[in-house]
């Protein structure tokens, strides 16, 4: 019928070589890499098209190698060797940098000197969204690494416009857009061609909700942009979340600047069940 739930029956996997369009989503490639060791004779994957969210593929390859899977990696090519018996190992799971982005946004929109601390983050993370630490320097957020913790501190920002290619980390688009709104910066983000096939059409959703603040938002297949708005930031705007956890969390950060209403707040449970609890620790009151 074209939608879940679906029934998958056991079958012998036999594919030897596949060609995948990497411009659609890195998730398709990661899923194939994960099942490849169980395919008799292994699997070769050739990638074509525009590169998208490659750090997530790198994380998948790194994990497979840690559990003993042999992989030959070249540009746009992976050969995964068969490994039927995988030995159990123990390793620590670091915190999610995508979730950290909301706290970067809060600090960016706060007064100079404001700071907060987040736990279990690595400076040498393979997560693509760990780039948030570098990105938010432009917004006046300094990241201080303290072992397995990071301290975010608000310092002076010298910009009033922001341009960036998010091809490697498109999940940051909503957070950055809201940060630019809150700071009154102009915004031009590109590399967003995968956002139309996320939980919702995120480009359209962003345009709809940002427009409620009086912004003239332009979107196309790959980008979103809007001019600086140095005027009064509207209060008590009602934000639709489109069943998308990132819409809820990114716009919730605006509460550091103005009152805001988030519809369907429980949507955050997809990735960050304790988000509202942690948000209140920053001083934002939710009810």
Language-model region placement:
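Structural preference for solvent-exposed beta-strand-turn elements
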Residues: 1-287
């Amino acid at each position: 019928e074209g939608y879940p739930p679906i029934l998958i029956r056991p079958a012998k996997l036999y594919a030897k070589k596949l060609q995948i369009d990497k411009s659609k989503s890195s998730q398709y490639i990661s899923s194939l890499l994960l099942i490849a060791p169980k395919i008799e004779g292994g699997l070769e994957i050739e990638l074509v098209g525009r590169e998208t969210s490659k750090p997530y593929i790198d994380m998948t390859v790194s994990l497979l190698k840690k559990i003993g899977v042999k992989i030959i990696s070249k540009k746009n090519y992976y050969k995964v060797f068969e490994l039927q018996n995988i030995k159990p190992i123990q390793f620590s799971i670091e915190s999610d940098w995508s979730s950290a982005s909301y706290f970067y946004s809060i600090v960016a929109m706060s007064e100079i000197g404001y700071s907060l601390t987040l736990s279990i983050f690595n400076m040498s993370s393979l997560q693509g969204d760990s780039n948030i630490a570098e990105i938010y320097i432009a917004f006046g957020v300094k990241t201080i690494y303290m072992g397995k913790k990071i301290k975010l501190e608000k310092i002076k920002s010298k910009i009033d416009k922001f341009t960036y290619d998010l091809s490697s980390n498109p999940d940051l688009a909503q957070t950055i857009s809201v940060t630019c709104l809150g700071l009154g910066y102009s915004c031009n983000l590109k590399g967003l061609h995968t956002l139309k096939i996320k939980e919702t059409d995120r480009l359209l959703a962003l345009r709809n909700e940002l427009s409620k603040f009086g912004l003239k938002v332009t979107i196309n297949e790959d980008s979103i942009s809007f001019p600086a708005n140095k005027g009064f930031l509207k209060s008590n705007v009602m934000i639709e979340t489109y069943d998308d956890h990132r819409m809820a969390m990114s716009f919730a950060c605006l509460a550091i600047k103005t009152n805001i209403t988030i519809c369907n707040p429980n949507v955050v449970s997809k990735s960050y069940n304790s988000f509202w609890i942690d948000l209140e620790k920053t001083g934002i009151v939710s009810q």
